[in-house]
């Protein structure tokens, strides 16, 4: 289901390949060590690519992180997430304790 171009994108040195099937690639970011699944869905679905994420190998499950129209866009989501993690996560709100 993945085109030659998509396979080359997923083989980028930015990632470490964990597992590959016809329907998904399981990869690890070399920058953060986070694990990702890029899954190709049926063409009839609105978003043909779903992105799943987990922080460590020991975490028993992945959570859905996002969807995209292309594998390239999904990989940009991962790189954006890595930048967010590396630059330090900012609190959504702060509580002042008196």
Predicted regions: what is each one?
Residues 1-33, 58-60, 91-98:
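Negatively charged, low-complexity tracts enriched in Asp/Glu with abundant Ser/Thr
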Residues 4-7, 53-98:
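Mixed-charge, Lys/Arg-enriched low-complexity segments
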Residues 33-63:
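Short aromatic-glycine-(Arg/Gly/Cys) micro-motifs in beta-strand/loop hairpins
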């Amino acid at each position: 289901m993945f085109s030659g171009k998509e396979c080359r994108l997923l083989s980028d040195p930015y990632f470490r390949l964990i597992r590959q099937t016809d329907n998904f690639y399981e990869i690890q970011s070399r920058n953060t060590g986070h694990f990702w699944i890029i899954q190709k869905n049926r063409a009839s679905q609105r978003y043909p690519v779903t992105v799943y994420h987990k922080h460590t190998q020991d975490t028993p499950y992945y959570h859905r992180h996002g969807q995209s129209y292309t594998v390239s866009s999904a990989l940009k989501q991962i790189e954006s997430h890595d930048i967010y993690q590396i630059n330090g996560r900012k609190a959504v709100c702060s509580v002042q304790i008196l």
